[in-house]
Each structure stands twice: as C-alpha cells, then as structure tokens.
Amino acid sequence: MSYNIGIDARKIADFGIGTYIRNLVQALGELDQENQYVLFVGLQNKEILEQLPGNFRVVIERSPSYSARELVFLSWRLFRLRLDLYHSTHYVLPAVVPCKAIVTIHDIIHLLYPEFLPSPLAFFYAQRMIRRSLSRGDRIIADSQNTKTDLMEYFDVDGRKIRVVYPGVAESFRHRVTQEEMNRTLAEFGLERPYLLFVGNPKPHKNLDNVIKAFARALEIHPFEADLVCVGDRSSIEFKIRQRASQLGLSDRLKLLGHVEDKDLPTLYQGATLFLFPTLYEGFGLPVVEAMASRVPVVTSNTSALKEVAEGYAHLVNPLDVEEIAKAIAQCMADEDHRDALIKLGVRRAEDFRWSRTAEQTLDVYNSALRRDSRKGKRQTDPKDKA
C-alpha cells in the first residue's frame, strides 16, 4: 500500500540538521519507490533538492522555522495535501497535524545549557515545543541513546515511544581523494603546512575557545609544525577568536575557513593530521564519524553522545580540562603508532553508520506509525517498540 508522506526540509541548508535532511532524503529516494513524498522547503533552497525520484515532489513553504507562522500555515498545508504521515525533522510540530506525526529530536542542548541561549524566551519556547511534540507525536526519533535518555529523564516520558536511529556518513568521506585533488583543494584554501582540523558552528557548546587554548598548550608540551584549521561559519565571533589566538601567539597558526561546500569537506578531512572535537554536548556528533570514515585520528569528548559513539575508537578527553585536551593533542602528534591505531579503530567504527541504514530504520518508524487498525484506531504491535 502506498502512503503520502510529508517531510519538513526547510532547514536543508543548515550545517547540522541540513546534513541530516539532505542525506536522509537522498537515501529514502534510493530505498523507497512505493510511497509518495512531499518535501517542504524554503524558496531559496528548492535547487538543493534537484534530481529527485519521480515519487518525490517539492512544495515551497515560506513559514520560517521556529515561528508562529509555521504552527498555523503548515497545519493548513497538511490539511490541503491530505498526507498520511508528516515527519518534522526538528523538534516543532504544527498546531494541528491531521495525520500520523513523526518528530526527530536531535538533542536538548537548549534545555541542558540554557546559558547558551539568547534569551529566557528561547528556553521556554524550546521546552514547550519539545514537550508538545513528545506528547502529540506518534513516534519520536532520537539521534542517539544519549538523546533518548535525556528526553526520558528531563520530560519523564515513556521510552517505548522513542526510537534511536543513528545518522549515517556520506560515502564521499570514505572515497579516497587523489593526490591531485588534495593538492588543488589545499592550495585553494591556502593551506601550506600540516594541520589539525576542527569542524563546527560558532555556538558556545562547540568549545572552540578551549580548543585554541589546548592547541597552544600542546605546542609547549611537544612542539610540532602544524596549523589549526577551523571550518564553519563563525563571522559572529571571528573577532573574539582572532583576539584569543593573538593573545596566545597563534595568529599565524590559526586558519578560519568559514563555510565550506560539501564537495570540499572530504578532502579537508583527509588532509588533516588530527581531528579535534572536544565539544561540551552533542546529540550525536556527526563530524566525529565523518573524520573516522576519512581515516583521520580523532580527539573528542568523554561526554554526551560523543562517548556513546566514540568510546574505544578515539582519544577521549574532558572537554572542560584544557590541560587534558592539550596532552591528548601532544601525544597524538608525537606518537605515530597511536595515530595509526586510532585511524584503524575509527574506520571500523564508521562502518556502523550508513545513510542507507538510517533510511531503512526511518522508513520502519514510518510504517510502525502507519500500521494501525483503521476500525479500532489502535496500532498493531511493533516488536521494535519494546526495545
């Protein structure tokens, strides 16, 4: 039986959620030719979803994410389109959802670290919307067991409604680039020396200040010839970053590349000597497994989902302890055998994360929600709900 399924893809251009949406949609397109899909996108993002299969179509939705408009206008669209199921790829559901509802909740950092939010209003909005989605959603998808546990503990909800579906790693990170491609890309970005890589947005929980301080301290512990390269839009905090680098004598060692196109990311990963990601909190930590798939040793945090994903496969540190991060960097840079061991472990771990598997499990969640007795209004038993 074919169903009409709507997916909120308005955040498709975003750094984190956008990666999730782009790869999930592509993998669903390769997996499922039976159901009909409607993708809600903003006007400026419709070109991102070119070359979709025939059972996918795009609907322009001008309501901004996290706005009052989306609560009303998306509800109206869902009524008009007569969908069987709607998948919200972030934590907000429209005011009324006249069909089955799936909600992906990537993390609850808004609630665990309210000091990072711009205002108390943002905290109360996130809290209310997540609580509402947990109540009204037929199924909840969490990026990790850590996020599922956070949801259960913070909101005191029944975990049987929440299904853990890990994101995947794009195959482009596993594909080895040629030396010619490597040389060309590094030259385009002006990278002339070996480098350590950090990938992330400018939000405080990414812990970039501690990364810079730890990099400087590592150079004191074990001097090495390498730069610190940071990928991600950080225009809002660039002055503070450069000021910190100047204070530490790193002005010529810090390279801020800003936003980088998806096509260039695998090359930048594969060119790195070491990947640094000691963030304070992650719902999954996709850059970690991207680095692992790229055959780069990883230093990351022993907290949140990062421990779940990387323990035993990366060098874990306390993200609040600059000295510990610095010693990890120094050890990795001094000990080639240690780096090689981390590379082998990381490649093995990255095999656990494929977008084809994410799509299969997401489609299984869809079918679980749709599998109901139409006469009694009760769902059939889904064995995965007991997990």
What feature does the model see in each segment?
Residues M1-A387:
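Carbohydrate transferase catalytic cores enriched for Leloir-type hexosyltransferases
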